[in-house]
């Protein structure tokens, strides 16, 4: 058995050596802690001081006017300045101190003239230039990013701010059902082969679950562990009716119907996913009257029908902050009063480091446009409770997602020639960076996955029946304990 985290004098930090994950050789902290409260205070205080220069209106009118006018510029200035001036969260760890040229080859002369030697390149400029072929990396992408603090600067750039102002903010404000369908179609209908080349045969685009940290379980094992866990938490029985909202390629729907003989319905906006899932159900010998994949918005389901069990795995991020409460209320209305909801959602930590912010903006631009509802756990819980749900259990699966992403990363590299032949170098590079950076971000807490088990907050709900499925309270001691008398 491998040991727990041990101190490595070469990097000045504790490191792990667990077979289940891609272990961090240099688990160093980044610069700054992003605080929404601090930003809000600055945005609110600046117009207060400026009111003295607008003497022709009442204080309230002047303040509101200045708040509207200065809010966005102040936010931009805050991000630009703080990302450059903030210190590392903890000043520990030993960087290699190598030159930029040891990590990459900069092919663009103008870029090379500005960034060389010990001059760190902004991370956004690096990945954009890499996608465009202006930069080639030396060695493995994941290895390169493990030492990113030695060669990259995690600062907000004008290009990032332009994206925030012209794309991200309008998406958050005007997020619509039509936008969801367009973005889902663009991403998930790119080609089943594209997704299979990293997702593998299970075709599950959500986090798997580790069961043994000292064993490198296959991607299929991680996903099978997750399917079993979700169905256990749902307490599936033959008489159940299951709804999978955002069912992907139908693997969970098929698994539930095949193993628990329940009636399972999956909904997706993707044409490719619906066709693939329908075929998967048939290929597994499940009768069409017991399982089906519908290509439709779940809000278009028959409002009079209720489901005894509902599951949604990493779909809610795409709903958008503006429509989140409405989405959860719709889910509430679809669930029977004694039903169970398993709600798995990707999220972030409440106090970001600036590298988390820059990674999040990359993800929104290149991988999951419109997925603006990846929020902190406390925010998600608050929204669920406001919708009328009560939490039974929460599991934080960030490191499990890192393990899953690492398997996806390995698959993507294995299928490089196929990707290049059909989709080209740029798409290969974008996904290589996405997968490698996400392995790290999920492992170190910048992003995570929350698996939440819920039911309606009603007096008549029989909470005692949930105890057998509450996995985290059932333990097997490593040795027989000596009891206190």
Predicted features, each with a name:
Residues 238-248:
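Conserved class I S-adenosyl-L-methionine
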Residues 299-310:
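A short acidic, Gly/Pro-enriched loop at the edge of an enzyme's catalytic core
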Residues 2-223, 229, 260:
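Feature captures hydrophobic
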Residues 325-337:
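A short glycine-rich, Lys/Arg-flanked "PGG" loop and its adjoining helix->strand segment in the class I
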Residues 338-346:
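Conserved beta-strand signature within the Rossmann-like core of class I S-adenosyl-L-methionine
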Residues 249-260:
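Conserved SAM-binding loop of SAM-dependent methyltransferases across substrates and taxa
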Residues 346-462, 468-472, 476:
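Substrate-binding/catalytic lobe of Class I Rossmann-like enzymes that use SAM or dcSAM, i.e.
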Residues 285-298:
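Conserved SAM-binding strand-loop segment of SAM-dependent methyltransferases
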